[in-house]
Structure formats: C-alpha cells, structure tokens
A protein has these predicted regions:
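Loop-centered beta-sheet repeat module
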Residues: 207-266
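Bacterial N-terminal signal peptides
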Residues: 4-16
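Solvent-exposed N-terminal domain segments of exported/luminal and surface proteins
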Residues: 23-224
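Non-transmembrane domains of secretory- and envelope-associated proteins
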Residues: 20-119, 233-234, 247-298, 306-307, ...
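Extended beta-strand-rich segments in extracellular/periplasmic secretory proteins, especially
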Residues: 95-98, 158, 166-191, 199-204, ...
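Short, surface-exposed coil-to-beta transition loops
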Residues: 209-211, 223-224, 320-325, 337, ...
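Active-site and channel-lining beta-strand-loop segments
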Residues: 228-230, 325-331, 339-343
Length: 415
C-alpha cells in the first residue's frame, strides 16, 4: 500500500515538475554512458571469447573491424585472440563532476565555454552537426588523473622486425585545471590558463641522454603549446615553436598522433560517423604487452568487443601528411582505441593501435584507476615500418615537485 502511495506521489510530482523528471532521465542516460556494460555485454554474431581470428576465418570480424585493419588479418600479417569485454568504470569523482557541471557547457564558434570538470558532453545526439567536435572535446578532457609518471620506451622497427632505433624516457605530467574537485586545481596555473605541463627526460641512448623537454599546454585550444628544450651537450635552453606535424626521432608518430589524437581541435573539421560495436585491443592483464605478427608490429594480447563512437577529422588547412583520419573512441572512457590516417591522395597510410592497462594490473602504483596507456603501435604501411611506444612503469596521482615543470627546473635537473 505504501509503495503504491509513494508511486502516486512521485507521479504527481513528475507531472507538475517536468524539469525534474527530465533531469533524472538525463542523469540515467549519463550513467548508462559511464556504465555501458551493466545491462549486458556487446555481441557480434560469430565472435566469442576464447576464439582466434586469422586468415582462415577473418570474415567473421567483417562487421567489427574496419576494412583497413581486416585486410591485414586476411593477409596473415597478424591474428586476433578474443577475450570477454572488460568493464572499466572511471573514478566516481570524475563521474560526479560530470553530473554537476555538464548542463552549463557550451560549444560556440569552436570554443568551449563554462567547462569546469568531468566529461564536457556526456549526452551525444547523433543528429547534432557538432557531435563529432563534441566527442573530440570529450577525448581532450577524458579522465587522466591529476598527475602521472611514465617510464616508456620507443622503438622504430622495420618490415623484418629489426629495431633501427630505440629510446627510453622519463615522462611526468601535471594537470593544473579541471580536476574533479575544483579546490585541488593549481591556482597559479589556472590564472594563466595553463591546462597541463609535460616534462620529458631522455634516458637512452647515450648520445641524447639527459636531453629534456618541457611542454606547457593551454586550456584554450587556439593557444599554441610552448616548448622549451634543454640540450645536454651545450647546457643551453631553447624555446621552440610548437609543430604538431613533427615526427620525433624520425619515427612514424607525429606529435599530434599521440594517444590516437592530441592535436589542436580547431585545426580540423569534425564529423560524427556513428556508434558501433568494434573489435579492439583489450586492456592487458600483464605489466607489459606482447608483440608479434609481421615486423613484430602488432599487439598480441587479447582483443575484445567494445562500444565505440567513430569520428572523422579533416584538416581545415594544409597538412603535410594527412588528408583525414578516423578515430574509434571508446564510449566508456573516451580514449582512442585505434585510429586510421590517410595520405594526401586519400589512401590508407597509417594505423595507430592503442593498448591500455587493465584495472588492478600494470607496473607501478596507479591508485584510483584511470585509463593509462600501455602501448601505441604506429604502423606506416607505405614505408613498411612502425614506431612502438611502450610503458614499462606507471606512478599515478602522487604529489610532484612543481619546480621540475619550469625553465629553472630544466637547469636544476640538467646534467
């Protein structure tokens, strides 16, 4: 009886307060985005956990893989083992910040307004002409924690799998703005509009050991990054003009290709191509990923089916390498799972395969889980070689000495 009365009262309230009912419905839709697998796991006919997909049965994955990747499974370049879909919920604080602030966020003439924290656009209308651009902003402000330290390596491998060059680094990143709890932002950085700072030190090989790079990224997408480089040989610091189209170390990864896409949003025209279930590299259950296939280019840890949004990005101006790129963005975490890039003639040139650490696994201290990258394979099929970026240790959300993230710090930490 009490339950019937309560339902009647709530029904009356919803009738007289339609705004409240709409807000609750929006909240449920947002939570469904952050927890998409609680109502069941995605399925594609013929694909089941434990199966192996290779050149003998590649057709089974035709609905879940882009043709640009499927053709190399068909050719026998690599094979895929399938695992069950992994639920990877983000931090509760990030989800709560999304619910608290999303309603006021606006996209006006390519600029984000009234953004505070969390996911800027948790509700994507597929018919919205700005849907693709909104997903790009979601990717930019995905949950990456407050601080993170990586100890990665990068190898340039040729068609035979021979490593032509290998580098090792220490990377530390601090996000000074848009933390889930506003009180935890860095006031001085926020006053200057500094979103994040990235410190990188080269550990090997010996000819470049001790070189340092400090990158300052601003919250405004139209404000270019500032870069300072410390040269260990001259013990001098130079300020460089940011070039997102530069490939470090002569590899197959432009600066803007990192994590699938880390370039300037305003330099591209964005188009939403739709949602789908895709077969993608799954989060690994080991400290480091396994490699194999042609050239030792491909991550061999199991792949899995996940809900993704597919977005196309075309340069609004001239680009030295690409005419367009496709991003396959994870619905739950807003990370890019893989990306495809096309040359100026429109031919498929590069594939970027991103592998992430699984919750409760991975090297180092991760604290509350955020999707840290374990590896990125950047494969150039025209040049027949690949850059393999791999993380060997991660320490997340621990206090860092901010002196390191300054020009003075480059001198202090210089050899």
């Amino acid at each position: 009886m009490y339950g019937k009365v309560l339902c009647g009262v709530l029904g009356s309230l919803l009738w007289v307060m339609p705004g409240w009912g709409q807000a609750e419905a929006e909240k449920e839709r947002i939570l469904a985005r952050f927890y998409p697998y609680r109502q069941g796991l995605p399925q594609v006919a013929g694909i089941t956990p434990g199966m192996r997909i290779d050149h003998t049965n590649y057709q089974v994955a035709a609905a879940a893989l882009p043709a640009e990747i499927l053709q190399y499974v068909q050719a026998g370049d690599f094979a895929i083992t399938v695992q069950e879909t992994t639920d990877m919920p983000l931090r509760e604080a990030y989800i709560r910040a999304t619910l608290d602030h999303f309603a006021r966020v606006e996209l006006h003439d390519g600029e984000l307004r009234h953004y505070v924290a969390g996911l800027p656009f948790p509700l994507i209308d597929p018919h919205d002409p700005k849907a693709g651009e909104k997903i790009a902003w979601n990717h930019r402000y995905r949950d990456r924690g407050e601080t993170v330290q990586y100890w990665p390596s990068n190898e340039l491998r040729n068609r035979d799998g021979v490593v032509e060059r290998a580098d090792r680094f220490y990377i530390a990143i601090v996000f000074g703005m848009h933390r889930p709890a506003e009180a935890h932002n860095l006031p001085q950085w926020a006053a200057q509009g500094v979103y994040s700072k990235n410190y990188m030190r080269t550990l090997a090989p010996s000819d470049v050991e001790g070189n340092q790079v400090l990158t300052c990224s601003y919250d405004r997408d139209t404000s270019p990054d500032e870069l300072w480089v410390y040269d260990v040989k001259t013990r001098r610091i130079r300020k460089l003009v940011d070039n997102p189209y530069q490939a470090g170390g002569g590899g197959e990864l432009l600066m803007e290709d990192r994590s699938g896409f880390s370039g300037y949003i305003h330099l591209y025209e964005w188009r939403y191509l739709g949602a789908q279930v895709a077969l993608v590299p799954g989060p690994i259950r080991t400290a480091t990923p396994s490699w194999g296939g042609r050239g030792n280019w491909y991550p061999l840890d199991p792949w899995e089916l996940r809900y993704v949004d597919v977005v196309e990005a075309r340069p609004t101006g001239s680009h030295p390498v690409y005419s367009r790129r496709l991003l396959y963005v994870d619905r739950q975490t807003s990370v890019t799972l893989y990306a495809l890039a096309y040359d100026l003639a429109g031919n498929h040139k590069r594939t970027f395969l991103n592998v992430y650490l699984r919750p409760a696994f991975g090297p180092g201290r991760q604290g509350e889980w955020v999707p840290h990258i374990a590896a990125q394979a950047s494969i150039d099929y025209q040049r027949e070689r690949a850059s393999i970026f791999q993380t060997h240790r991660v320490v997340a959300n621990e206090p860092l000495n901010l002196n390191r993230f300054s020009i003075v710090g480059l001198m202090l930490y210089g050899k």
